[in-house]
């Protein structure tokens, strides 16, 4: 049994090292899934195209079934040395070599070792893979299997499970194990060390390709994760996957344990942050100090986001470190205004908020309201900082504050935000509204007005985002009573929508179309199944003939 566990651990190492062989298996050194195609779906298909670095390939790349080979090698009682060489006690991630010297040598390494192993197994009467002369069995432009590989993300649930794991020993702090994964390069000691409260995304240092001695992201991630999983397995503690499918198969990911209520991950981050427009050094004078700051409730947004990269897409740093008023090369010249207000980007404030109003509880109203711009809308987020006048802000007084001081200013701004006033007294809201001004073939419709208002209020609940923007008592009413001032007694629909459609006023539907468009559209967006759009008599009974 002990030998069986040992072989399993070696199988995991084989899985890790083959996957991360930058320049060994992938010509581009990435963990891209192979193109979709017919046949068996596998998460372990790896594209071998290392020869591509020396020029155009003569034959198609090889679709290598890694988990299948891992199982076979383990079954023969072999370990990683069957495919990987070592130097100074460290195993190379390249296949049967330490360096890439020439195209001819690389070709010989693959053919001699892969085909050689297959041939030896065939001589022993065992099931094996393609042999000499069966080139297209491996170099097949249409492999028999198709990739089901799915990228794995390190969301806050998975992150917390690692933070809370007693199997991952603390490094540098008896109470925290952050240093087991997070590190920075210390120039003085020439070592990787943990930077407390400076933990960053892996992508902050590790990109798609290796740079100097810094490995690419896929190499760094697989090396760290799989080796840690193997070390933990040696202690007989619960550990993570050690093969391709364990992480990258969709069915495996669907079974991951999910922590629903994740405690806040502590990185020394502020509860509240002050977002200031930072002009670039070369910004024109008129671009400086022209916008009021935004108090950002960082703690509340942490609870809503799935991971830090939801907002911090590369480095965990302030937005304005890259996105200045006039843009920087690091931000690909995406200016601060675009970074915060781009309506179709999930990484901008406005873009993320737009997805929230598309949820069924909000879409009934917001799906019908056309986006507009006004100074009043800007003023919901952009407000004056208490204790600082416009001249002080323009002179850079807020920018010159220490981080802790800016956080305090932001907190005071958040606490001073106007509280939502809810809606009008429910006793003043009609319980039912009889809609019968155009009743003809059908009887008037009894509209459960107060019930619908209560449903909308319940849908908002304690939502802070809704509370921030639904300030006035009549805000909620304007989902239906649109294009008129918020009021307890808004104009009737017929005030704007004529009973017959007026072609000369083609900017608005007639009354019948307005009712049906508003009611049916709301039901569709809120996914209300009954009454169905075709069930006329569910809303207004048919008149007796």
Swiss-Prot record:
Binding, heme c 13: 449, 477, 480-481
Keywords of the record: Electron transport, Heme, Iron, Metal-binding, Periplasm, Repeat, Signal, Transport
Residues where heme c 14 binds: 482, 493, 496-497
Binding site for heme c 11: 362, 365-366, 470
Positions bound to heme c 1: 66, 80, 83-84
Subcellular location: Periplasm
A Gene Ontology cellular-component term: periplasmic space
Single GO term (MF): heme binding
Protein name: High-molecular-weight cytochrome c
Natural source organism: Nitratidesulfovibrio vulgaris (strain ATCC 29579 / DSM 644 / CCUG 34227 / NCIMB 8303 / VKM B-1760 / Hildenborough) (Desulfovibrio vulgaris)
Gene: hmcA
